[in-house]
């Protein structure tokens, strides 16, 4: 029933875009990533700088839930995908929101990533990371721009999950 009402509201707002835009503020920013040297033949300074350079993350999904922290049963109120330059934007009514990435939408992340011979998981860190999301924002009477995020690629672990540490052997 809840899902039906959510779809009904979304359909109404989509059918009347001028009404939906009224009273909203635009939230926008850029998402970037940079790499790390992960062993093997030592790179030249030029190659190392190239690896560590910030690059836009295209296709990165940002989800929005109402409230100041992520809750499992909270509904997603908006989402957006970064463009080829890593830019994203969405329109929100005044209020408090938490921004999330895909891995923070449900608690499967705790089953997906468990400690192993080569990965160490900080469970307290994972709980806090899941709860806090990417960030929380308060939307008032003005738009929020330059809400930027940067991910440093660490060796042999997923890019955007900060609570994992590689403890295995590095390539010679």
Locate predicted features.
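Bacterial Sec-dependent signal peptides at the C-terminal "C-region" and cleavage site
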Residues: 8-23
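Short beta-strand segments within Ig-like beta-sandwich modules, predominantly Fibronectin type-III
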Residues: 78-82
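A short tyrosine-centered beta-strand micro-motif
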Residues: 93-101
